[in-house]
Regions:
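Short, charged phosphate-coordinating catalytic segments
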Residues: 64-76, 123-145
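Short coil turns linking two alpha-helices in DNA-binding domains
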Residues: 48-49, 129, 188
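DNA breakage-rejoining catalytic core of tyrosine-based enzymes
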Residues: 7, 73-75, 85-104, 155-167, ...
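Conserved tyrosine-mediated DNA breakage-rejoining catalytic core shared by Y-recombinases
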Residues: 82-86, 126, 135-175
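C-terminal catalytic core of Y-nucleophile DNA break-rejoin enzymes
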Residues: 88, 154-220
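N-terminal core-binding DNA-recognition domain of tyrosine recombinases/integrases
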Residues: 1-90, 105, 109, 178-179
C-alpha cells in the first residue's frame, strides 16, 4: 500500500497529487482494470476545470493547516507550493428590460419556476452571494433594510452590510412571509443555477453571450 504522513509529506508530493487530479480521467481510460475496484461506472472521472483543481488544492492545504493547528505536525510543506488564482471570465448581465421581463412573467402554470424567479430577482436587487441569500432569516430585515454579515469576509472584516430594499424586493418577501423558516425558500446551488436557466428560457431570454471555458481557458 501507499501511505502519506503529515510530518513527512513534501511539497513535491502535493504537486504529484495535483498532476494526478488533472490527469485522472486519462488514467481511468488507460487502466480500467485498476479502477474496477472503486465501482465508478455511474460517476467516471471527467476532465476537471482549472477552477475545480484550484478548489481541491485549497482544500488539501486546509487539511495541512488543520494538522498543524492540532499539533500533529510542524511540517509546513502545505505552504511551500503555489496555488494559482482562479481565472474568471468576463461577467455578463441581464439588461434592466430583461430583468423586468423576468419579474413580470406569468409563471402561474409553473410554480416551481416562480420560486426560482423570485429568488433570482431578490438576489439581483440586494447584490448578495448565493450562500448569504439562503442564510437570511426575518432577523435580517429591519424595516425596509436588509442587514447581514457577508460570510466571505466576516473573518477578516466583521462589518454589517445594510441594503435598502426596493419595492420589487419587498413584494417578493411578502409572497413568502411565514411560509418557511428562512426568509426565502432554499435550494441547492446546482438546482438554483439550473432553475435560473429554465426561467430565462421560459421568458424567451436566449441571446448569445461569451463565457470562459474553464477547462480550456478560452472564451467561447
Amino acid at each position: 500500500g501507499f501511505t502519506l504522513y503529515c510530518e513527512t509529506i513534501r511539497p513535491e508530493e502535493y504537486l504529484d497529487f495535483r498532476e494526478y487530479v488533472i490527469n485522472e480521467y486519462i488514467h481511468y481510460n488507460d487502466y480500467p482494470e485498476f479502477y474496477e475496484q472503486f465501482s465508478l461506472d455511474m460517476h467516471p472521472p471527467k476532465q476537471m476545470s482549472s477552477t475545480q483543481i484550484i478548489g481541491i488544492m485549497h482544500h488539501l492545504r486546509i487539511v495541512g493547516h488543520w494538522c498543524i493547528k492540532m499539533g500533529f505536525t510542524t511540517n509546513r510543506s502545505c505552504d511551500a507550493f503555489t496555488i494559482p488564482a482562479a481565472v474568471q471570465g468576463t461577467p455578463f448581465y441581464l439588461t434592466i428590460e430583461e430583468r423586468d421581463k423576468v419579474y413580470n412573467a406569468n409563471l402561474q402554470n409553473k410554480p416551481e419556476l416562480e420560486v426560482y424567479r423570485d429568488l433570482f430577482i431578490f438576489q439581483s436587487m440586494v447584490g448578495c452571494r448565493v450562500g448569504d441569500l439562503f442564510s437570511f432569516t426575518k432577523d435580517n430585515i429591519v424595516g425596509d433594510i436588509l442587514q447581514y454579515l457577508p460570510h466571505k469576509t466576516m473573518r477578516k472584516r466583521s462589518q454589517t452590510v445594510s441594503v435598502p430594499l426596493t419595492t420589487k424586493a419587498m413584494e417578493i418577501l411578502k409572497r413568502y412571509d411565514g411560509k418557511q423558516e428562512k426568509l426565502l425558500p432554499t435550494k441547492q446551488v446546482y438546482q438554483y443555477n439550473e432553475g435560473i436557466r429554465a426561467v430565462l428560457r421560459e421568458c424567451g431570454i436566449n441571446r448569445m453571450v461569451t463565457i470562459l471555458d474553464t477547462v480550456t481557458g478560452k472564451e467561447v
